[in-house]
UniProtKB/Swiss-Prot annotation:
It comes from Bacillus thermoproteolyticus. This is Thermolysin. GO terms for cellular component: extracellular region. Its EC number is 3.4.24.27. Its cofactor is Ca(2+); Zn(2+).
Amino acid sequence: MKMKMKLASFGLAAGLAAQVFLPYNALASTEHVTWNQQFQTPQFISGDLLKVNGTSPEELVYQYVEKNENKFKFHENAKDTLQLKEKKNDNLGFTFMRFQQTYKGIPVFGAVVTSHVKDGTLTALSGTLIPNLDTKGSLKSGKKLSEKQARDIAEKDLVANVTKEVPEYEQGKDTEFVVYVNGDEASLAYVVNLNFLTPEPGNWLYIIDAVDGKILNKFNQLDAAKPGDVKSITGTSTVGVGRGVLGDQKNINTTYSTYYYLQDNTRGNGIFTYDAKYRTTLPGSLWADADNQFFASYDAPAVDAHYYAGVTYDYYKNVHNRLSYDGNNAAIRSSVHYSQGYNNAFWNGSQMVYGDGDGQTFIPLSGGIDVVAHELTHAVTDYTAGLIYQNESGAINEAISDIFGTLVEFYANKNPDWEIGEDVYTPGISGDSLRSMSDPAKYGDPDHYSKRYTGTQDNGGVHINSGIINKAAYLISQGGTHYGVSVVGIGRDKLGKIFYRALTQYLTPTSNFSQLRAAAVQSATDLYGSTSQEVASVKQAFDAVGVK
């Protein structure tokens, strides 16, 4: 969730982040192209791209890339370089594929491409292929540092500049060897993940040059997801009753085994809610009660965390046919009463964590259904587009969580509105919220691309610039006139379907606002047809916020 105080961070690779829509050397009259400004290569292509009878969907992609090698500035063997990571058929008749670009078997950081094939025709290619890696002398020398040396460099910097003490790591120190590209420079590098809860929660990603040990990039990606181990109680499924943070009564699924536990066995591999008991050790104790009635004030945050996790699960299952955040029914864990007076909620990489607030800035954060759904949507994003939590890709990441947090609030019909966190933020100030999707400028966030934040605070403006996309989403749903551009609203349901398809099938880790526009337009085209009002409204909304 966004705090009013922003965090400092470095900028993401400019070459991956810089994209723009230009009428630049169109590949064919039937193709629509969004170009990467830095590389002057295609970033998003749609149309009837290639049809070869008797060819597999992935082979169409390889042939298309090689056929257009000069446009992509990509002169390597596509089949050897593009590693197929995912392939599935969707309910619209498309074969969807996700590829990871590699260089001599080494993954290129953030370089993911998705493609769509229908009726034997390649119809879309989304994502930036990093060009001319075969000409980079810096990649030919080989690595000189070990994984341990890279981790030591990252930890030393973390302690010196972030934590001021050696933290207790929650999930070890994961390290991956990659090719990292920043503008025209390419480096062999280690990606080091440092995940911890004390002295303050963090999930830092360091990019360390594997030759000279230089820190190439670093940022806090607290909402990145990895499944955690869950120990369940063997018992009888029951239904309890309790009262939430705002005093509303609700039924909750529990499990009986001597005590009644906040363990919901009816959804996927379970929903589990824990009591952190004001400590910072997770997950804490699985919440237990003697009589299956949760009406004590201490129970309220647990009641809401448990109930709203279930509502979020139901939304994704019933509306988008998605089973939990990973699409494979992963268990959902939540811990409440984290630390003392803690003014935040976050996904720590494997579970939800909720502070109780200090009573002035926040009340217990699990009391906001949009807060719960926002954070769980970060996990959905990590398992699909994998949007890097920095600069424009990070702002899209935040906006996606705001959009679906709001849509879950409407789905539950829980006093729904287009504000974020209004139920738990500043209880002494009526009508206040963290962000507004209908009017981002109300809280100082930009509502037009010309007003975007371009500094390094807030991971390059991930919460700030999300306002631009939030406003576009609001206009797509509700309609209106913004900066002189009129938008015809198409409703929340269609907004959700368009953005869910864009998130899960077209966006890639380094997507920027231009690619999001192209992805949303293509998703609307897939769902409703190229001449539909839905496509027109998506274009109008992005025009209204200055995203081309």
